[in-house]
Amino acid sequence: MEIAARDVKSLRDKTGAGMMECKRALQECAGDALCAEKYLKERGLAAIENRRGRATAEGVIVIKARHAEGAACGASAVAMVELVCETDFVAKNAEFIALAERIAQAVLEHAYTEVNQVLRDMVVDLATRVRENMSLTRLALLRAGSAGAGQYLSHYVHPDKKTGVVLSFSSDAPDVFLRSDVRAFAYDCCLHAAAYTPRYVRAEDVPAEYVREQREVFQAHVASLQKPAHVKESIVQGKLEKHLAEICFLKQPFVKDDKLSVEKKMAEVGARAGGALRFTQALIYQLGVQ
C-alpha cells in the first residue's frame, strides 16, 4: 500500500518515532493513523521492557514551588522530583528536563505524595520516543502553614541539577520570616546543605547502632596507645563528637561563616530578628544517592 509522505510526517509529529517506523506502522494498519499510533506505542512499550534492566546513572532533580499571596510570604508548598535516564546526552536534553518540570508541577498541583501510574505514564511517553530507560525514582511534597503560621520553606537546585534541597523552618514569632536577612539565611542554609550534603539534621537523629559502630572503630584506633583507660575513652569521645559534627547539619561549620556552626548561626540570626528559628524538616536529594 502506498503511504503519503504527509501522513508519515503527521504520525512522526504526534509520536516522535522515526520516519521509517511511522511508514511501516501505517502500512501495517492500512493507512489508519489511530491504529498506527497505537501500534507504535505498543512497540515502544515492548522496547521499554527490554531496556528496563539498563543502568540509569544520569538524570535531573527539579523543584517547583507554589507561592502564597504576597512576595513576603514565601512558598506555601514545594515539590521536588528525581527523574533518571541512561545517558548524559538525554539528561541534558530540553525535552527531558521539561518532562521533569511537568512532573514536579503535577506533584505540586495534585498533592501527590508517591509515584503513581499517572506520573509513570508521563515518563513512558518520552521513553518510547527517545528509546532510553527512564524512571521517576522519587518525589517529595513539603507544605508550609498559612502566612502567619510561623513556617517558612526555602529551596535550591544546583545548576547541574544533580543536587536539590528543600528546608522547612519554624518560629514562634511569625514576622521574622518577613525579614530579608532571615530569608537570606534560610537560602544560605540550602546552599550549605547542597555543598556539604549532611546525612542527619541533629545528633539525636543518628541511629544508635551507627553511633555504637563508630565508637567501636575509634576504640580500635586507640587500643594500642600506651595511655590510661580514661584518657583513651576521652580520645574516643572526642573523635566521635568530631565525626557527628561532620555528618549532622546543625553541627557543621556554616558555609558563609565557618567560625560558627549552623546551629549557632541560626541562634544568632534569630536573636537579631527577635524570634528563635528552628528546622522542622530537611530534604536533600543527590542524583542516584538514596
UniProtKB/Swiss-Prot annotation:
Alphabetized InterPro entries for the sequence: EF-Ts_dimer_sf, Transl_elong_EFTs/EF1B, Transl_elong_EFTs/EF1B_dimer, Transl_elong_Ts_CS, UBA-like_sf
Major localization class: cytoplasm
UniProt KW DNA-binding keyword: no
Superkingdom of this protein's organism: Bacteria
Record's subcellular location: Cytoplasm
Pfam family, one: EF_TS
Coiled-coil boundaries: none
GO cellular component: cytoplasm
Region annotation (Involved in Mg(2+) ion dislocation from EF-Tu) ranges: 87-90
Alphabetical UniProt keywords: Cytoplasm, Elongation factor, Protein biosynthesis
Record GO terms (molecular function): translation elongation factor activity
Family designation: Belongs to the EF-Ts family.
Stored PANTHER family: ELONGATION FACTOR TS, ELONGATION FACTOR TS, MITOCHONDRIAL
NCBIfam families for this protein: tsf
Protein role: Associates with the EF-Tu.GDP complex and induces the exchange of GDP to GTP. It remains bound to the aminoacyl-tRNA.EF-Tu.GTP complex up to the GTP hydrolysis stage on the ribosome.
Identification of the protein by name: Elongation factor Ts
Organism of derivation: Treponema pallidum (strain Nichols)
